[in-house]
Amino acid sequence: MKCIVGLGNPGAKYTNTRHNIGFLAIDALAKEHGIKLTESKFKAVFGTGMIKGERVVLVKPLTYMNLSGEAVRPLLDFYKIAVEDVLVIYDDLDLPLEKMRLRSKGSAGGHNGVKSLIQHLGTQDIKRLKLGVGRPPAPIQVIDWVLMPFAKSEQTTLQHVLSDSVNIATDFIDTPFLALMNRYN
């Protein structure tokens, strides 16, 4: 069984913000594969289904971003999913909106949601799909930028990014991660 986690913040005011691009990616993936995110426990909303013949759980933690690990750890324990079978999708300030990058491990890189996952999962060896949201233009502060909705002028690019993230997450199910990185990075 595989687990794909999108990081974000719960609540309507965060719905289409840059920090919630991980949630947007999970919603797009769920829609593509007909998986309903109707389960609600372990401080998360999630759904299970089949992708490429493999059972998969798609997860959106309902903790705030900085506590994401509190939702993911118990869910992995419940389903007996190994950390190496997890892909985490989240926003990255250091990549422009149209860019994305796969990584098999590493530090949190200043991302508090990833920091929480590393802390609760006990390893930095967490597979990730980082979706670029870009750096804020001056004088906008980072905290304000990531909590801003995407501009109308960014919507077409955002839809392409979400479509690409669906393809990558789908291929994660049956493709060795090194091959996945070679294909998409």
Swiss-Prot record:
Molecular function terms in GO for this entry? peptidyl-tRNA hydrolase activity; tRNA binding
> What would be one Gene Ontology cellular-component term for the protein?
cytoplasm
* Listed EC numbers: 3.1.1.29
Q: How does it assemble?
A: Monomer.
Instruction: Report the function annotation for this chain.
Output: Hydrolyzes ribosome-free peptidyl-tRNAs (with 1 or more amino acids incorporated), which drop off the ribosome during protein synthesis, or as a result of ribosome stalling. Catalyzes the release of premature peptidyl moieties from peptidyl-tRNA molecules trapped in stalled 50S ribosomal subunits, and thus maintains levels of free tRNAs and 50S ribosomes.
In chain numbering, the residues marked as site (Discriminates between blocked and unblocked aminoacyl-tRNA) are N9
GTP-binding as a keyword? no
Instruction: Indicate the family of this protein.
Output: Belongs to the PTH family.
Q: Which UniProt keywords apply?
A: Cytoplasm, Hydrolase, RNA-binding, tRNA-binding
Residues at site: Stabilizes the basic form of H active site to accept a proton? D91
The residues that the entry says bind tRNA are Y14, Y64, N66, N112
Q: Which residues form the active site?
A: H19
Which organism is this entry from? Exiguobacterium sibiricum (strain DSM 17290 / CCUG 55495 / CIP 109462 / JCM 13490 / 255-15)
Q: What is the protein name given in its UniProt record? A: Peptidyl-tRNA hydrolase
What does the entry give for GO biological process?
Answer: protein quality control for misfolded or incompletely synthesized proteins; rescue of stalled ribosome
Query: Could you tell me where this protein is found in the cell?
Result: Cytoplasm
Its EC top class is hydrolase
